[in-house]
């Protein structure tokens, strides 16, 4: 059996321990490695000729990407998970206790358990390569660093910096890591091993004291000051998580107890808290998202189809969506993009949009001005169909007008090659209708981005009846290169995300008309776990956009999609939301919120002809909106709009911010139980009408006591 860890000795007395997990592209830490590492450490202790040890990865572009998350599923109880953490503590403590200098030579991803391994070394040197990133992202999986990270990190970089890293899961670049004291040196990859060897030969060095601001020195240097830091962090966490995520509070407690009672006590608390989190429903849900997205990256979107290489893209329309799509095409996918718009203003807007985003990277020192300029050079513009003939894909982002989109299809078929894909960024028009104008309908597909394009991770790839498998696979691969998470959905009004969102938004509007206040509605859904409330979302998306989509959905999908009368009243008062500075909330000049705390525009109640009454329980408000979304998600599965519950969960989480700790609509239905959901829906149906009627699939599942997962 091939070993993961190989020890070689140099003539100068430095031993090199290379980690290379057989058959894997990246190194991950597995439980079964414990005995192998302990055996090697015993060998090192016995060999007096070894003067120093360097840890390095045998993989091309990663140090250690973290612990193997799948081993957590083998933990049947909290006791199993605690034993796993304690095993890590034993091995890392043994490494740290070696009486020779131990240096970690880091190139590529050094995350989670990988960084904890590096922290147990006496010194760290990393490459200055763009692929080198250091961090502890466990919180994103509902966990905490369980290999001593909550104890070693604050002792190395300071409490405030360590908490920031652990509570956000952010990844740190090499120069930043050096500045904060996380690594001792940053060098080109070509001399990484040589530098690590020299550091080991120079002998153990105590870490340089981290430069801290005067305030941090005063706070971190006393027990009283540390308590202020922990109390402030706890308050911020409670506000941000709304009590829905247990991991951040436990991370703070680990650091707090470790700093007050010593490393050993801190490690005991870490192992206990880690164990509780591993078996929590929140972490199980977050890990299911991780596994789902990992699995999806291996899929082409169309079985058996091979994607064609996209060497050039054309974007039709230089508006907000067009500019955003062009930007992610050039900056993320590194694919040349030609933007076509009928007027120069649209083109200058698209260029300006991309430049501002890249310039932020320069200001944050994530890239050099030369890199920014090279990426900008990938974007070109035109007001006519010039320089588009060799496009592999054309993404159309013009107005939601069927006749206009038909014209675009005809233009592209005339101007481009026979294999050029025509991808429409429509949010509501069925793709089959757009494809009616095509002589090559197999090349027509939907590619629905969400706004703002550079921030929203999801894209819906919409296949109509005649879309070819090759077109689907090529479009999915293109979206992935843009840094997106694509889900393939079938054609139909609203596709998946807007369809489930529409009923949720309609119900919120209905509650508003019944006298629930705007702030209360938004607070209730934020407390439930959404990033923003439904009324804020309507202001952001645009009340006019909602009003345009609603009748299309009602025509195609029936009476339950009938929008409340609120839209017409608001539009007749010229309220479109943030875009024109007039909506449910007040906006100052320049369309910026007048203060950090949003203020409701009280005059909107008069426009709607309502008077806010007594607010219902927040949980009742949230339930009424959310059950509509859940019911419709199951209908979408039944109608074949989405291929699987997994895709439905990912679409809702990444497309509309469905609370990740619930795992997505389908995971949440399993948690509630289909029988309980049916009872809730039937109760509302009796009270408010047939828009709450449970769909047939849910009734069957309730009767048969079945689950989605």
Swiss-Prot record:
InterPro entries recorded: 3-OHacyl-CoA_DH_NAD-bd, 3HC_DH_C, 6-PGluconate_DH-like_C_sf, ClpP/crotonase-like_dom_sf, Enoyl-CoA_hydra/iso, FA_oxidation_alpha_subunit, FadJ, NAD(P)-bd_dom_sf
UniProt GO molecular function: 3-hydroxybutyryl-CoA epimerase activity; enoyl-CoA hydratase activity; long-chain-3-hydroxyacyl-CoA dehydrogenase activity; NAD+ binding
A Pfam family per the record: 3HCDH_N
UniProt pathway annotation: Lipid metabolism; fatty acid beta-oxidation
Catalytic reaction equation(s): a (3S)-3-hydroxyacyl-CoA = a (2E)-enoyl-CoA + H2O; a 4-saturated-(3S)-3-hydroxyacyl-CoA = a (3E)-enoyl-CoA + H2O; a (3S)-3-hydroxyacyl-CoA + NAD(+) = a 3-oxoacyl-CoA + NADH + H(+); (3S)-3-hydroxybutanoyl-CoA = (3R)-3-hydroxybutanoyl-CoA
Region: Enoyl-CoA hydratase, residue numbers: 1-188
Predominant place of localization: cytoplasm
Region: 3-hydroxyacyl-CoA dehydrogenase, residue numbers: 308-709
Subcellular location: Cytoplasm
Enzyme Commission numbers on file: 4.2.1.17, 5.1.2.3, 1.1.1.35
GO terms under cellular component: cytoplasm
Disulfide pairings: none
Site (Important for catalytic activity) location in chain: 116, 138
Keywords: Cytoplasm, Fatty acid metabolism, Isomerase, Lipid degradation, Lipid metabolism, Lyase, Multifunctional enzyme, NAD, Oxidoreductase
Superkingdom of origin organism: Bacteria
Biological process according to GO: fatty acid beta-oxidation
Subunit organization: Heterotetramer of two alpha chains (FadJ) and two beta chains (FadI).
Function noted in UniProt: Catalyzes the formation of a hydroxyacyl-CoA by addition of water on enoyl-CoA. Also exhibits 3-hydroxyacyl-CoA epimerase and 3-hydroxyacyl-CoA dehydrogenase activities.
Similarity annotation: In the N-terminal section; belongs to the enoyl-CoA hydratase/isomerase family.
HAMAP family attached to this UniProt entry: FadJ
Protein name from the UniProt record: Fatty acid oxidation complex subunit alpha
Provenance organism: Shewanella sp. (strain MR-7)
């Amino acid at each position: 059996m091939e070993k993961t860890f190989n020890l070689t000795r140099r003539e100068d007395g430095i031993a090199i321990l290379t980690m290379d997990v057989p058959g894997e592209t990246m190194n991950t830490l597995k439980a079964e490695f414990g005995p192998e590492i302990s055996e090697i450490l015993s060998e090192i202790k016995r060999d007096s000729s070894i003067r120093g040890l360097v840890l390095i990865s045998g993989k091309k572009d990663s140090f250690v990407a973290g612990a193997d998350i799948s081993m957590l599923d083998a933990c049947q109880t909290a006791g199993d998970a605690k034993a796993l953490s304690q095993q890590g503590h034993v091995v890392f403590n043994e490494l740290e206790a070696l009486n020779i200098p131990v240096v970690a030579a880091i190139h590529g991803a050094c995350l989670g358990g990988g960084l904890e391994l590096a922290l147990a070394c006496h010194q760290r040197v990393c490459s200055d390569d763009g692929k080198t990133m250091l961090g502890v992202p466990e919180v994103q999986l509902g966990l905490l660093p369980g290999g001593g990270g909550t104890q070693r990190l604050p002792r190395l970089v300071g409490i405030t910096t360590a908490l920031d890293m652990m509570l956000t899961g952010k990844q740190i670049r090499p120069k930043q890591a050096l500045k904060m004291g996380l690594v001792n040196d940053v060098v080109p990859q070509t001399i990484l091993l040589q530098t690590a060897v020299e550091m080991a030969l120079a002998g153990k060095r105590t870490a340089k004291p981290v430069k801290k601001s005067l305030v941090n020195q005063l706070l971190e240097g006393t027990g009283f000051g540390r308590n202020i830091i922990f109390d402030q962090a706890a308050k911020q966490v409670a506000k941000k998580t709304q009590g829905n995520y247990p991991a951040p509070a436990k991370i703070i407690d680990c650091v707090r107890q470790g700093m007050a009672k010593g490393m050993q006590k801190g490690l005991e608390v870490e192992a206990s808290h880690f164990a509780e989190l591993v078996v929590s429903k929140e972490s199980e849900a977050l890990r299911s998202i991780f596994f789902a997205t990992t699995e999806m990256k291996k899929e082409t979107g169309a079985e058996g189809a091979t994607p064609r290489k996209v060497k050039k893209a054309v974007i039709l329309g230089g508006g907000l969506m067009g500019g955003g799509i062009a930007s992610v095409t050039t900056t993320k996918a590194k694919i040349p993009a030609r933007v076509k718009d009928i007027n120069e203003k649209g083109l200058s807007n698209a260029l300006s949009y991309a430049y501002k985003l890249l310039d932020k990277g320069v200001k944050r020192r994530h890239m050099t001005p030369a890199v920014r300029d090279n990426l900008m050079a990938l974007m070109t513009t035109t007001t006519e169909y010039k320089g588009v003939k060799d496009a592999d894909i054309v993404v159309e982002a013009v107005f939601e007008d069927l006749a206009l989109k038909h014209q675009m299809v005809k233009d592209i078929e005339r101007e481009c090659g026979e294999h050029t894909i025509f991808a429409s960024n429509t949010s509501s028009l069925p793709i089959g209708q757009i494809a009616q104008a095509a002589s090559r309908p197999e090349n027509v597909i939907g590619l629905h981005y969400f706004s703002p394009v550079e921030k929203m991770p999801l894209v819906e790839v919409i296949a109509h009846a005649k879309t070819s498998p090759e077109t689907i696979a090529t479009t999915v691969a293109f979206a992935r290169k843009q840094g997106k998470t694509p889900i393939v959905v079938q054609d139909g009004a609203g596709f998946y995300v807007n369809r489930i969102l529409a009923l949720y938004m309609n119900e919120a509007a209905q509650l508003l008309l019944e006298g629930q206040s705007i702030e209360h509605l938004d607070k209730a859904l934020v407390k439930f776990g959404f990033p923003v409330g439904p009324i804020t979302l309507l202001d952001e998306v645009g009340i006019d956009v909602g009003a345009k989509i609603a009748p299309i959905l009602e025509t195609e999908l029936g009476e339950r999609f009938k929008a409340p009368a609120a839209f017409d009243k608001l539009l007749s008062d010229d309220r479109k939301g943030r875009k024109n500075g007039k909506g449910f909330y007040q906006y100052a000049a320049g369309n910026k919120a007048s203060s950090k705390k949003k203020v409701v525009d009280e005059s909107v109640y008069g426009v709607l002809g309502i008077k806010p009454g007594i607010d219902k329980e927040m949980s009742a408000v949230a339930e009424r909106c959310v059950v509509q979304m859940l019911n419709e998600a199951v209908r979408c599965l039944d109608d074949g709009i989405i291929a699987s519950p997994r895709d439905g969960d990912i679409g809702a989480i990444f497309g509309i911010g469905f609370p990740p700790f619930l795992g997505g609509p389908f995971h949440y239905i399993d948690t509630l139980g289909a029988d309980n959901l049916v009872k809730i829906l039937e109760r509302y149906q009796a009270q408010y009408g047939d828009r709450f009627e449970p769909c047939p699939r849910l009734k069957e599942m309730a009767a048969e006591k079945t689950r989605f997962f």
